[in-house]
Amino acid sequence: MSSIRELESRVGEEVGISPWLEVSQERIDTFARAVEDFQWIHVDPQRARASPFGGTIAHGFLTLSLLSRLSEMTFSFSDRRMGVNYGLNRVRFTAPVPSGSRVRARFTLAKYEPLEGQGVQVTWNAVVEIEGVDKPALVAEWIGRHYYA
């Protein structure tokens, strides 16, 4: 899909599935430093082996923040000057993301709302999946604004 305007006819449809993205321990550690959240379940592999998770896991907010990257890997809109996050609804962290696992996102378009000629507001039902795991890591309603080039 090359145009943000093409989305208007796709409301209610799954519009894209991202490629897989690795959630490495390095990525988790970098996120921990950025947000100053050093809880051992995220950054201490030795101690985390004895946890209910059997190893370190990604922060829930790291998984949530990956939506931006996963969407960039999925969509390329030639008529978009820029996009901004507008908000989130109904976010749930439904399964832990183990260090070293791979995730991808499925994007279903829930709403498409024009912004008075300057762009559109879209609401995605986003589901982040973990490779080889039936239960999703995250489900969220993600609202973004996209401004025309």
Residue ranges and their predicted role:
Residues M1-A58, F75, A149:
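Catalytic strand-loop segment that frames the active site of acyl-thioester-processing enzymes
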Residues Q39-H42, A50, G83-Y86, W124-V128, ...:
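Short, low-complexity, polar/charged sequence segments that are solvent-exposed and flexible
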Residues I17-P19, R27, D37, R80-N89, ...:
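A generic structural signal for short beta-strands and their flanking turns/coil linkers
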Residues S51-G55, S65-R106, A110:
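Hydrophobic beta-strand-centered segment that forms part of the acyl-chain substrate-binding groove
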Residues H59, T63:
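Hydrophobic (often cysteine-bearing) scaffold residues that line and stabilize catalytic clefts
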Residues D29-A32, L64-S68:
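Predominant activation on well-ordered alpha-helical scaffold segments within soluble catalytic domains
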Residues M1-R10, P96-A149:
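HotDog/MaoC-like acyl-thioester-processing domains
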Residues E22-V23, Q46, L64, L70, ...:
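Residue-level detector of alpha-helical segments with a strong bias toward transmembrane helices
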